Amino acid sequence: QAREALRGKWPMAAVAALIYSAIAGGLSAIPVIGGLCSLFVGLPVAYGFTIVMLGVCRGKDIDFGVLFEGFQDYGRIFVTMLLQAVYTILWSLLLVIPGIIKSYSYAMTSFILKDEPEMKNNAAIEKSMAMMEGNKMKLFMLDLSFIGWAILCIFTLGIGLLFLQPYVAISRAAFYEDLKAQQGGSVEVNVEVNVEI
C-alpha cells in the first residue's frame, strides 16, 4: 500500500525527507542554542513531515509547504508534540522497555492532530493510546520489517534513508488509516506492507 502510494512520487518524497533532515540536522548543529532550536522548530517540522506523508498515503501530490503546516497552528501542535516527547522520556527513565511501549501508544498523535483540529494536548495523546490498545505489537512488527533496509542504507552513506524514511512514514500513515476506518468495530489491523523498493 505504501509503495503504491509512492508510485511516481519517490523523487519528491526523497526531497521532502532531505529538507526535513537538513532542518533537523542543521538546527541541532547550532552551538549553544541548537537544542532549543531543535525543540521549538524541529517538533513542528517533524509533525509537518508526517502530515506530508499522510497526504501521499491519501493520494495527494507532495506539497513542500505542508512541511511547515505545524507553524500555522503552532501552540496546539508544539505543546502536544512536546508533551508526547516528555511523557516518552519520563517513561524511559524508569526502564527502556516502558518508554518504547509508550512511544507506540502515542504513535498516532500527529495524525489525530491533523484530522481533528479541535483536539489538542492530552486529548490527542489519549485518543492515540485508545487507538493503539491491542495494536502496539502490530506497529512494532511493521517497523521491524524495515530493519534490513535500514542496515543496507548504511552502505549508501545514508542516501538510502532519503527513500526509506518516507516509505516508513507512509506505511505508518496507512496503519493509521486502517485503524481509523475500523473505529466503529473491531480494532484488528490488516495493513499489508511490502518493503520491496
Regions found by a protein language model. Name each.
Residues 1-197:
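Hydrophobic alpha-helical membrane segments
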